[in-house]
Regions:
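An often Trp-containing, charged/polar helix-loop segment at the C-terminal end
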Residues: 128-134
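Active-site neighborhood of phospho(di)ester-bond hydrolases with catalytic His/Asp-centered motifs
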Residues: 144-146
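Subtilisin-like serine protease catalytic core
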Residues: 1-121, 137-142, 151-154
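Well-ordered, non-membrane alpha-helical segments in soluble/globular domains
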Residues: 123, 157-158
Length: 158
């Protein structure tokens, strides 16, 4: 089973997203905020593979983050993914997520606009990407999108 998130990114160095041998559980990470090598059928961002993330992990944090410069500056995506699928390595198995044995897919949404959020189209592309990856891998997927809004009237009679 795959667990996918569209969120603020992920700290891929976090132990809960690594296997016992230290390799990553993240099969793909699409960072929409980093220009460079977008996934097939998309025009923005950079896609990182499991192999690239494993190479970054082997280099250590300083050098590794140069190779795969994707992060989670707010921590929200990392927390969400941990609740959904963290394996508990950081807490010796005490604090693990719901689907702690699953493989992971991550979409980090693009940079927010001034006084705003990333575009809705980026969110939709992220969901589309996750579904396409699951189909390609022939695996079922659960997708978490932890975004909401407060649109519309807030008067008591509207």
């Amino acid at each position: 089973i795959l667990v996918g998130i569209v969120d603020s990114g992920v700290d891929y160095f976090h132990p809960d997203f690594r296997n016992e041998d230290g390799s990553t559980r993240i099969l793909r990470l699409w960072d929409q905020s980093v220009a460079g090598n977008p996934p097939e059928n998309y025009v923005s961002g950079t896609e990182y593979t499991k192999e690239e993330i494993d190479e970054a992990l082997a280099l250590g944090e300083t050098e590794g983050r140069r190779l795969v410069p994707s992060g989670d500056f707010s921590g929200h995506g990392t927390a969400v993914l941990g609740i959904a699928a963290g394996n508990g390595r950081a807490s010796e198995g005490v604090k693990r997520g719901v689907a702690y044995r699953s493989d992971l897919l991550v979409v980090k949404m693009g940079n927010p606009r001034e006084n705003s959020f990333p575009r809705t189209t980026e969110l939709m592309e992220g969901i589309d990407y996750l579904i396409r990856q699951a189909v390609k891998m022939r695996k079922p997927i659960v997708i978490n999108v932890s975004f909401g809004n407060n649109y519309g009237s807030h008067e008591p009679y509207n």
